[in-house]
């Protein structure tokens, strides 16, 4: 997992490229949590990704924001999909968000209970039937199947 910060510090594009490349060579899936603004590091990650996943809450404001950014992202990397997190306060459905944004719906999920608390106090421990784990499995299933990882017969991939 590679993530930046919201506090003005920008990741270096070379560092992002090195992490993604090392992950691929090591045979692991690399997940990059990208900011909303396009930076050199963001561009590097988007260029390298086998799949770009936009995660959106299921509400009108988020739908509008997703609809705005989707065409920009698709010019950088056409392998784009959507995960919608609900529930919707007004009855909007995940499929409607995907249709409006013009993106394929990879997964929809309800909010993961106690997610922030788990992350702040020792890390994420998901049960296999949790909303986040189920959505993650659906997204990972979209990625191309692994080829040959050094020592294990599988290859790495960036997401």
Protein language model regions, located:
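An amphipathic, basic-hydrophobic helix/alpha-beta surface used to engage anionic
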Residues: 66
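Conserved catalytic network of the ASCE P-loop NTPase/AAA+ motor domain
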Residues: 22-25, 46-47, 74-75
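Short, small-residue-enriched loops and turns at beta-alpha junctions
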Residues: 7-11, 38, 60-63
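Conserved beta-strand segments of the P-loop GTPase G domain that flank and frequently precede/overlap
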Residues: 3-4, 31-33, 53-58, 81-86
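C-terminal lobe/tail of nucleotide-utilizing enzymes
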Residues: 75-159
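P-loop/Walker-type NTP enzyme "switch/lid" segment
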Residues: 1-28, 115-121, 125-127
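Inter-motif core of Ras-like GTPase G domains
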Residues: 27, 36-60
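A general structural detector for well-ordered alpha-helical segments in enzyme core domains, enriched
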Residues: 16-19, 69, 93
């Amino acid at each position: 997992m590679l993530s930046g910060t919201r506090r003005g510090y920008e990741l270096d594009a070379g560092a992002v490229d090195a992490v993604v490349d090392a992950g691929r060579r090591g045979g692991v899936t690399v997940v990059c949590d990208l900011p909303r603004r396009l930076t050199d590091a963001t561009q590097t990650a988007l260029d390298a990704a086998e799949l770009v996943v936009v995660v959106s809450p299921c509400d009108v404001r988020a739908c509008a924001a997703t609809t705005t950014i989707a065409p920009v992202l698709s010019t950088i990397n056409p392998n784009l999909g959507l995960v919608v997190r609900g529930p919707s306060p007004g009855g909007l459905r995940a499929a409607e968000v995907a249709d409006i944004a013009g993106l394929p719906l990879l997964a929809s999920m309800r909010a993961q209970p106690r997610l922030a608390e788990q992350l702040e106090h020792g890390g994420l421990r998901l049960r296999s039937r949790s909303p986040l784990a189920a959505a993650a499995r659906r997204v990972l299933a979209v990625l191309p199947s692994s080829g040959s990882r050094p020592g294990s017969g599988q290859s790495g991939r960036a997401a």
